[in-house]
A protein has these predicted regions:
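Alpha-helical tetratricopeptide repeat
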Residues: 2-260
Length: 260
């Protein structure tokens, strides 16, 4: 009997991390053929052939329509391709088969966030965290959704929890996100502290320099504001981020044009 392959994929999109969980053995009326399609889909996911993976998982599901892993992995491929509604539908199918499929809840939370369904994102991540309260990514997703709902202090709590669980992976982005929430909550000194932490970890983080510069300006420190914004513009240009560079340069011109 053929066994389904185990695949773990981590994809970084901004501050977000998506994980495919371990996969179980399959028993069906067409066990070999379904698993063959499934395993080929896994191989295609690993190779970055997302359309091919979708086709194979679809074939596997025609033979075994109650395979939560196949729905989950097809949803993953659809997510990477930007097919968000299809991804949500497949994560929902995976959860119909297995209501405790924590990664399906977490990834559906993420897709809800991308499609600006912030309340639904919070609901899914809250359910996921009830099943696995040690998954930093779910706190990040929920924090992002709460921040966009204007619940900045609750977002700060989620980012703080993520930082306590995250280890070293992606901490520059989490400090940055928490700094933004502090900015929006009117706590500029706390925001400044987090931008400092973010830049200690990643000294080439152009956006962190930009927002730290704006924070210095709000705190009345024009000299440091200009220095950070100029650094942001230089870094952004070197990284091909023309939009960020233009914003930083415009902010410098605006500050320099004002009377002290």
């Amino acid at each position: 009997m053929k066994i389904k392959k185990k695949l773990t994929i981590i994809i970084a999109i901004a501050t977000f991390l998506l994980t495919i969980s371990p996969l179980s053995a399959q028993t069906t009326a067409n066990p070999v053929k379904a698993v063959e399609f499934y395993n080929r889909g896994v191989d295609r996911l690993s190779a970055g052939d997302y359309s091919g993976a979708i086709a194979d998982f679809t074939q596997a599901l025609q033979l075994e329509p109650k395979d939560a892993d196949a729905y989950y992995n097809r949803g993953y491929a659809e997510l990477v391709l930007g097919q968000y509604e299809q991804a949500i539908a497949d994560y929902t199918q995976a959860l119909t088969v297995n209501p405790n499929y924590v990664n399906a809840l977490g990834n559906r939370c993420y897709v809800h966030y991308l499609t600006k369904k912030y309340e639904a994102a919070v609901e899914d991540c809250t359910k996921a965290l009830a099943l696995n309260g040690n998954f930093a990514d779910f706190f990040i997703y929920r924090g992002n959704a709460k921040d966009d709902l204007g619940k900045h202090l609750e977002a700060i709590e989620d980012y703080t929890k993520a930082l306590s669980l995250q280890g070293t992976r992606g901490q520059d982005r989490i400090f940055y996100n928490r700094a933004l929430s502090y900015n929006r909550a009117g706590q500029q000194e706390m925001a400044l502290r987090d931008y400092n932490e973010s830049l200690k970890i990643n000294a080439n983080f152009a956006e962190a320099y930009h927002n730290r510069g704006l924070t210095y300006y709000k705190l009345g420190n024009r000299e440091k504001a200009i220095a950070d914004l100029e650094a942001a513009a230089r870094l952004a240009l070197s990284q091909g981020k023309q939009g960020t560079a233009a914003k930083s340069q415009s902010a410098v011109a605006l500050i320099q044009g004002q009377k002290p």
